[in-house]
Amino acid sequence: MGAFDFLKNFLKKSRGKNGKEGPCAAAEKKEEQGPSSDLIFEEFSAIQKNAVSIAYSHAGQALAPGKSKIGGRPHVPQGFVWPYFEGADFDNVVKNRPLAFLAQFDLAEVKTFDKDDVLPAKGMLYFFYDAETQRWGFDPADKGCARVLYYDGDVGALSAAEFPDDLPAEYRIPEQRLVFSARRELPDWEEYAREGRAIGDWEEYDDARARFGCPPTEEPDGVHKLLGYADVIQDEMTEECETVARGIYCGDVRSDLSAAEKDDIRARAEDWTLLLQLGTLADDDFELMWGDCGCIYFYIRRQDLRDKNFGNVRLMLQCT
């Protein structure tokens, strides 16, 4: 049975035998009419996104320059300068620290799995983050705690950079080879639940998305992917990205924003899309966790992604 057939039967919960409504169901139907399966199918088809899932395994030996990977030393062009960030750690010690190298992606390799055709067709994409301070991302001052660099030159000119001497060993991720796959996704309830949506109940929504073939993720910290929708642990993050990008702290409820400002932020939040999600990274006796079983999420404006402008990416960290 296909996704449409499942959805077509989705809301027929109050049917009796032989498909006939019982007396209670008939009475309830007058008070509350659920959305049609056709409407749900049309909405899901319109909002679904493709994600590039990432599976990793220990590399064993150094990978060739330009290969997609997590950890190890980044393969960079001549003149590369390792990014640093000045911020406070968990003991409130403020200093300039080197960012941990997280991953690099050969976009020509990834492109096969980018079914929505939103990433550049070629080049290298590098991700860095201050793993020592683990900034949450909801403070405008956190800008720079994560960096995304793009290189579209000759891959043959790349070579492995040396780790900075002041980068602690616990943030030097062992090199991992990657395997990609494509999968379609729907947003988690926190991101879906906006005015005018077809479904107004989270349990009903999770049931419907499972029937559509996009069930919610049970353990987000085990998910690593490019694109798609974030596996939300706390709250929806696109509004936070837009708020912080305007220089507004959003670590608490903002009561001083006008209704018009809040409406504009909510509207502009639609411009933001997930670029990368990383959960806990582990290899034998190495483990790098974000908070307590959390994830880090890199978000980018759609127009910036089209323009290959990765200088305004925002990072968000969520954990349990």
Where are the language model's segments positioned?
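Preference for intrinsically disordered or flexible, low-complexity segments
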Residues: 3-11, 15-320
